[in-house]
Every structure is written in C-alpha cells, then in structure tokens.
Amino acid sequence: MAATCEISNVFSNYFNAMYSSEDPTLAPAPLTTFGTEDFVLTLNNQHMSPEGPVGCVGPQTRSQRDRTEPPAVLHLAEKASWTGERPQFWSKTQVLDWISYQVEKNKYDASSIDFSRCDMDGATLCNCALEELRLVFGPLGDQLHAQLRDLTSSSSDELSWIIELLEKDGMTFQEGLGDSGPFDQGSPFAQELLDDGRQASPYYGSSYGPGAPSPGSSDFSTSGTDTPQSSHSSDSGGSDVDLDLTDSKVFPRDGFPDYKKGEPKHGKRKRGRPRKLSKEYWDCLEGKKSKHAPRGTHLWEFIRDILIHPELNEGLMKWENRHEGVFKFLRSEAVAQLWGQKKKNSNMTYEKLSRAMRYYYKREILERVDGRRLVYKFGKNSSGWKEEEVGESQN
C-alpha cells in the first residue's frame, strides 16, 4: 500500500510540473514536441497564447529542435533524479521517476500498470527479463527493456575501460577454477584464499602422491605460540596459507643452515618441536614471493591500485589521510562491480566485498576506522600505497 502511494505521489509531481505556469492567472495546456529519434515532452511557457493553447508541432529532427526550442523549455529527462546514474545503482525512488518519465514520454495509460510490482531498486529492475516487464507494464515493457539495455551497455563499457587500464598496468588476474566467482564457495572468502595460495605458492602446478601432504595442509603447518613460521604467515601480505618451502625447487636446500641431509623429501615430519628457521630464510622467501606474485591479484591490492592511480579513480574512492593510509569508498557498489568483473562474478555487491575485507583485519593488512561508515585504513603489513613506495616503483 505504501509503495502504491509513493508511486502516485511521483506521478502527481510530474503532472504538476507539466501543467503549472509561471503566471498564476494563466493555465494553458502544454505544447508537446515529438521528435523522430525519440519522444521528448517539453513545456513551453513563452509560446503560450492567452486565448488558449498552441497546437502540436509536427515531427522535427534533433538538430531542428535544438535551433527552434527557446531556453525556457524544460526537458523532463534532464531534470529527473535518475539521470547521470547507472541503472544498476538506482534507488527505488529513481526507478519510479524513470518509469514515470517513460509513461509520460510514450503517452501510456498508467492505470494499466501493476503498481504493486514496481517497488524495486535499479539492480532488481535490470535483472527483469523482457517477459516480466511485459507482464507488469504491458506493451510498454518492450520500450523499457530496450532503454535499459542501452543504458546498462554504456555503463558496462565504462567499467570495462577501467578494467582494461588496470590490466595494461600489469594488474592481471587469475582465472577461476571453473567457478563463477570468489564468494560462491559457502564462505565469502573461500575463493580468495584459494587464489592467494595458488599465486604465492611455488608448489602450484606440481603434483603430489597420495601419501604426500600438500602445502598449506596440517602436515606442513606449524604449531605452538613461539614458532617464527606461524607468526610470520600473519605478517605477510602476499600469501594466505602457511608454507614450508624447504622442499621447493625454487630454494636449494644447501642454502639453509637448518637443513639436514637425512630428512625425507616428502611425508610427515619427525616428532618433536618444529625447527626454527633463520632470518635469512625468511628474507629469501619474501624476496621470491614479491617477485612472482602479480599485482592487484588480492582484494586489498585491488583497492590500493585504484587509490594510487588517479586516472582510474573517477570518483570511486578517495584518500582521507594519505600519510596514515586512511581511505573512503565514495561509490561502493561501483567498486564492488569492478571487483566482480575482475573475478568473473556478476553477483558481486559491496556487502560481499566488505565481508571479504574483514579477512585482512587479523593479518593487519586492513583496519576498520571505528565510527565512520565506508572508511578503512591500511595496516602495518600492507605495502605499496605510500607516496615514497609509489615513486620507487615507477622509477
């Protein structure tokens, strides 16, 4: 019932705007102009006659209208709330405004519309099939479907342009394992974990026997509170799994003082406390990971790269305090859609993206700024966002 009242108010506002006059003593009917390219309903106050309304003008091209229309002509489409915004991000009110505009533009009988089914936002409207629009709007459904297709295709081209620039700058992404996106595995972070492990691990691509444990399994992870391996994995921004790379072909065994010739090549470790690895080992490991991990492959890196590239950050995000690493989402759903395109997930939303960002809190890569909506901060284990770091990477 409330939705029907709101829709009625929207239609009333449009009728008031159409039939109102600057002179309260005159209330002539509007002058309508119909173009061959599209129908534009205009209100002309300068050409009104005190004796009555002026008749309808015949078909004109867009260029002819531009030359003949006076400055006082009110274009409803230009004044509407939905202009300048992508249909996917329209609010319920903007959807109603757009439907009202289409009804007036096409001279459609509004009484035949099922108002109870118009209470939807832009994302829901864009997901409606042609048959659904015909069911709700009748013959007008074909016109609405065609207009939506044109509007959404233009906005998709803009997002694709940003993705293309990100890729040209070296921010490539890994294809999913036959999955539609990073958040369809039960947990919103499942695919992100898998991607991170695949990209950072030198074991990726090799095969293991049935009895040999794989990297990241319980046989390779260490236990205890004082082991450097466990604490170091939480400090690293490049990998989301614990790795023991002493068996990797990338690192020769002879280069590490803790290596013993008699250790088995695969299988479970011997009983006892896990061996402690030297600082040189971790320095070498970090160097290898930083060279092989592609840029922009993790969510926090994707956010960082948008912030540090002004040519890509067209009102998507902004720095609140660059020195402290504090930033804010300005168009959160647009950023989520970009991340969804990057991960081949068309159902990505900011709600899912924000849940994925929480995963980085424990690792101190990202921090939430208390009391401020859409505001976050890079943690001590993040990198590549400081001005001096950006300058060094460009040299």
From Swiss-Prot:
Quaternary data = Interacts with TBP. Interacts with CREBBP and EP300; these act as transcriptional coactivators of ELF3 and positively modulate its function. Interacts with XRCC5/KU86 and XRCC6/KU70; these inhibit the ability of ELF3 to bind DNA and negatively modulate its transcriptional activity. Associated with CLND7 and POU2F3. Interacts with ZNF768.
Q: Quote a single Gene Ontology cellular component term.
A: nucleus
* UniProt biased composition (Basic residues): 266-275
GO BP, one example? extracellular matrix organization
Query: Any idea which residues the entry calls the DNA-binding region?
Result: 297-379
Sequence ranges assigned to domain PNT in this UniProt record: 69-155
The region called Disordered is annotated at: 200-275
Question: Which SUPFAM superfamilies does the entry mention?
Answer: SAM/Pointed domain, Winged helix' DNA-binding domain
Biased region (Low complexity) positions are 200-240
Q: Which organism is it from?
A: Rattus norvegicus
Q: What is this protein called?
A: ETS-related transcription factor Elf-3
Q: Name one GO molecular function term.
A: DNA binding
